[in-house]
A protein has these predicted regions:
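C-terminal helix-cap and adjacent tail motif
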Residues: 2-9, 15-16, 166-198
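Helix-biased detector of long, well-ordered alpha-helical tracts
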Residues: 100, 108-112, 191-198
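Small-aliphatic-rich amphipathic alpha-helix that forms the alpha element of a beta-alpha
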Residues: 43, 102, 108-156
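A structural motif
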Residues: 97-103
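Short, electropositive alpha-helical surface patch
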Residues: 154-167
Length: 198
């Protein structure tokens, strides 16, 4: 590889990982289609045992978010048929919290060498890659799961099959507020060299 001896191509990426955070409040604009297409393609470069490609993703933006909101309302009414208008409207608005939503779906294949948890992790890696790339381009995202990820009305409305599972809703847009201070994390709380010395 021919590069300047002073160059450190990994530095910026490591800095981005260290600065990444979730942005629960997002607004327009979302990244344009050209940028999104590049991000989506690159995000697929993850560990994928036996090349099962155990994932698919739904991109929901614009007025289509209202249809997702309708599914959230169906879930609300299924749990409480007497839910009032205010409760239903609150559920509906949750689909409008960002200009773009990527629904990450694990598509499980029965394979003797690749358990479902490994396939789920691979799908999660793609979602995480998308979030990192979004942040590196000056936008923000937040990964949500919650009851809608396992809701029958939502899963059926989004066309999930019996071998599929929603792993997250990645909300994407422009952060509405400036960066919040990053909470300190101590590496040594989670990483230990083995064997441990007594």
């Amino acid at each position: 590889m021919d590069m300047d001896s002073n160059a450190n191509p990994g530095k910026n990426f490591i800095e981005i990982m260290g600065q990444r955070r979730s942005f629960p409040r997002l607004e327009e604009p979302a990244p344009d289609k050209e940028l999104l297409d590049n991000i989506f393609l690159s995000s697929l470069r993850v560990p994928d045992h036996m090349h099962l490609r155990p994932w698919r993703f739904l991109i929901i933006g614009g007025d289509d978010r209202n249809y997702l909101g309708d599914l959230f309302v169906k879930d609300c009414l299924q749990k409480d048929p007497n839910a009032g208008e205010e409760t239903c409207e609150s559920a509906r608005k949750k689909a409008l919290r960002a200009p773009l939503i990527v629904v990450g779906i694990a598509h499980y294949t029965d394979h003797p060498k690749v358990p479902e948890i490994e396939q789920a992790l691979a799908t999660g890696c793609v979602l995480n890659n998308i979030g990192l790339a979004i942040y590196s381009c000056g936008y923000g995202s937040v990964w949500r799961t919650g009851p809608y990820a396992v809701s029958s009305p939502v899963c059926e409305g989004l066309g999930l099959n019996s071998n599929e599972e929603i792993l997250g809703f990645l909300y994407i847009g422009t952060p509405m507020k400036a960066d919040r201070p990053i909470k300190a994390i101590k590496k040594d709380d989670f990483f230990k060299y083995w064997p441990a010395k007594v």
